[in-house]
């Protein structure tokens, strides 16, 4: 699994690629910690997970997202989900994670919910 990072104004976009399951969840969580352990004001207003390149997520992967959201909230931040592929969206819906994490159809829509500046920065790329 790869985890690409982009910053749009005051919002961090993290883009996992491939599969998120028991085999790589610990490494994924470790990679996330460096972005989530800082207070929101010092790093970013929030984090958007662009799941457009995530092919599959298991229950272990869902747990990683839940822990990330909890950690972000503890530091005054917020996590949003965007651009889920149909299979991943179905897993989120069946597991009712759509009630835990706010999801948006596009990265731009998620960015807009954080700040107009981040959406404009995204439009310039």
Predicted features along the sequence, with ranges:
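General small-molecule cofactor/ligand-binding pocket signal
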Residues: 4-6, 82, 102-104
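Residues that form or immediately flank small-molecule/cofactor binding pockets and catalytic motifs
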Residues: 8-10, 86, 108
């Amino acid at each position: 699994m790869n985890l690409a990072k982009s910053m749009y104004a005051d919002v961090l976009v993290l883009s996992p690629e491939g599969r998120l399951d028991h085999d790589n969840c610990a490494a994924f969580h470790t990679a996330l910690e460096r972005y989530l352990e800082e207070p929101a004001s010092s790093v970013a207003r929030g984090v958007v997970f662009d799941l457009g390149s995530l092919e599959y997520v298991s229950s272990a992967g869902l747990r990683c997202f839940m822990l990330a959201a909890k950690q972000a909230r503890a530091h005054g931040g917020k996590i949003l989900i965007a651009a889920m592929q149909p299979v991943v969206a179905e897993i989120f819906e069946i597991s009712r994670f759509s009630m835990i994490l706010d999801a948006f159809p596009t990265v731009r829509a998620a960015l807009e919910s954080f700040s107009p500046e981040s959406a404009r920065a995204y439009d310039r790329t």
